[in-house]
Amino acid sequence: MTEAIIIDGKEFSSNLRNKIAEDVKAFKKERNVVPGLAVVLVGEDPASRIYVRKKEEMTTAVGMNSLSYRLDANASQQELLDLIETLNHDPAVHGILVQLPLPKHIDTPTILEAIDPDKDVDGFHVVNAGRLAIGTPSLVPCTPAGCMMLLEHSLGSLKGKNALVIGRSTIVGRPMAQLLLAADCTVTVAHRHTKNLEELCRQADIVVAAVGIPHFVKASWLKPGAVVIDVGINRVPAEDEAAKAAGKTRIVGDVDFVEAAKVASAITPVPGGVGPMTIACLLNNTVQAARNLTSAS
């Protein structure tokens, strides 16, 4: 049996960042403007700090301005709203990202809706969600955008494909379904409570797993030759007994990768698949936002 092609998100995202760097260079020459991405971090969550640092490094690497804002964990919601309002009106800022999760005393939807939709490079604002739903050009959530790039790279045209999205979050599942519809797929959205999930999987040419449960999707569910995009990032105990006893962990996806790779024609690994694409698409959105904002001014 032929093993699946491993879809290398690291390599693809590296090539995409190189292209973005060229776009930034051309944009600077054309409009004499440097795209600026403002990243706001509230508190000292260790994982968030790592993500923010990666975003800052990659923003600078492609030639854009990286603007960092740090608020204390007990900063008030109004303080954060005031900062966002300032960034909304700052002409040097073309993209605004508020790192999630936020402290419990801050209402996340209120914060996300306060960001100027034209600077909402995460694509989470209700205006951008609405634009996506009706097929109007918009800033698209980064993870689904990255998934689409990987699918189109693997399959070429997606027209007429049966696509199953397992997961219904506003960050991945729902926008993913909208993007697949726009690409002329026949789309089914399922979740952990869907009764005939295995049957739906066996009919799908494309399976996007974004349910947040380790190894939820089994190889036996898959249609032979399906393309599998695993969005899951789940931390589980290390396989090695000594490492497990020491409390060490490893990252796995929502798909049983080893067995699924024996059935699928192509599959993303975890880590190294979808994850690297998310930051690259964030940078891509920032350049797009800068173009939109400067052309409108």
Curated annotation (Swiss-Prot):
Superkingdom: Bacteria
Gene Ontology BP terms: L-histidine biosynthetic process; methionine biosynthetic process; purine nucleotide biosynthetic process; tetrahydrofolate interconversion
GO MF term set: methenyltetrahydrofolate cyclohydrolase activity; methylenetetrahydrofolate dehydrogenase (NADP+) activity
Cited InterPro entries: Aminoacid_DH-like_N_sf, NAD(P)-bd_dom_sf, THF_DH/CycHdrlase, THF_DH/CycHdrlase_cat_dom, THF_DH/CycHdrlase_CS, THF_DH/CycHdrlase_NAD-bd_dom
Amino-acid positions noted as binding NADP(+) in the UniProt annotation, renumbered to this chain: G167, R168, S169, I233
Entry EC no(s): 1.5.1.5, 3.5.4.9
Catalyzed reactions per annotation: (6R)-5,10-methylene-5,6,7,8-tetrahydrofolate + NADP(+) = (6R)-5,10-methenyltetrahydrofolate + NADPH; (6R)-5,10-methenyltetrahydrofolate + H2O = (6R)-10-formyltetrahydrofolate + H(+)
GO cellular component: cytosol
Keywords: Amino-acid biosynthesis, Histidine biosynthesis, Hydrolase, Methionine biosynthesis, Multifunctional enzyme, NADP, One-carbon metabolism, Oxidoreductase, Purine biosynthesis
Pathway participation: One-carbon metabolism; tetrahydrofolate interconversion
PANTHER family in the record: C-1-TETRAHYDROFOLATE SYNTHASE, CYTOPLASMIC (PTHR48099:SF5), C-1-TETRAHYDROFOLATE SYNTHASE, CYTOPLASMIC-RELATED (PTHR48099)
Family: Belongs to the tetrahydrofolate dehydrogenase/cyclohydrolase family.
Quaternary structure and partners: Homodimer.
Physiological role: Catalyzes the oxidation of 5,10-methylenetetrahydrofolate to 5,10-methenyltetrahydrofolate and then the hydrolysis of 5,10-methenyltetrahydrofolate to 10-formyltetrahydrofolate.
Protein name: Bifunctional protein FolD
Organism the protein comes from: Zymomonas mobilis subsp. mobilis (strain ATCC 31821 / ZM4 / CP4)
GN (gene name): folD
